[in-house]
Amino acid sequence: MSERTALLAWLAASWSSVLWMLERATTGESEAGELLAFAAFLLVLWRTRRAVPEAEPQVLAASLALALSACATFERLPLIAAMSSVSALCLLASPRRFGCRLHLPTFGLAMLALPVMPHLQFYLGYPLRLATAALAVPLLRGAGFAVSRAGTGLQHGDGILWVDAPCSGIRMLWAAAFLLCVLAIRARLGSLAFALGALGTLALVVCGNALRAAALFFAERAPEHGLLSSHEALGLAVFALTAGAIVRFVSWLTAAKRRSSPCAA
């Protein structure tokens, strides 16, 4: 099957998901991050040279994904339908573009291009808030504060500083995942190295968010030290540190896996 034939077949089977994504983009429902990830995804597919031009696309797996997409469309589950459709596209493109069954970094970009943020907040928000509060406690105790964790809050004396939903770190996690995917594509990380990078990125985000929570607590409880108390400014500063750590970690993975293929076959 030629690449053009596979693409036309995918468009014919995924027209409802394509229209749904286009409607979100044109009506302003899509966030800027989703559009950025989608643009990066298309750019990767367009610019990547065919590593194995004679490789056959994963037609069976892609067909199953498209069947799931059709079922989800029938049940009026547009996000699941779109996720299945882009999974099928990645399965069709990966063998020839990257020489593997499924190129995980590109697949990750495709998932980030969808409206997954509310679902990440729903499923991961509370666990991340718990982890943030738990890790912030020893940081603050080391700074001399008698702090204890109270659920997702930091208790000091009679007051509690809550780690609420906006401070869960979900947006930082999304941005870190985008950065990881871009770096992994550029460095041609293998599947195992990318999986290790994902675990390391998650750990760095949790630690970075705990540092942000501790800094905000310190800024509110000890304003005389002049620490910047703006949530946005502190968030940007901590994310810059976290992003730098992710870049260093990916560089280490690249050096360790320099001779690996773009992904495991």
Where would I find each of the regions flagged by the language model?
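Membrane-interface helix caps and helix-loop-helix hairpins in membrane proteins
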Residues: 20-28, 70-82, 95-99, 119-123, ...
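Active-site beta-strand/loop microenvironment that shapes enzyme catalytic pockets
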Residues: 72-78, 85-99, 106, 168-224
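Extracytosolic (periplasmic/ER-lumenal) interhelical loops and adjacent juxtamembrane/interface segments
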Residues: 6, 10-11, 120-160
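N- or domain-start disorder-to-order transition segments that initiate the globular core
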Residues: 1-28, 37-54, 260-265
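Membrane-interface transmembrane-helix boundary segments in multi-pass integral membrane proteins
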Residues: 29-30, 161-162, 168, 196-200, ...
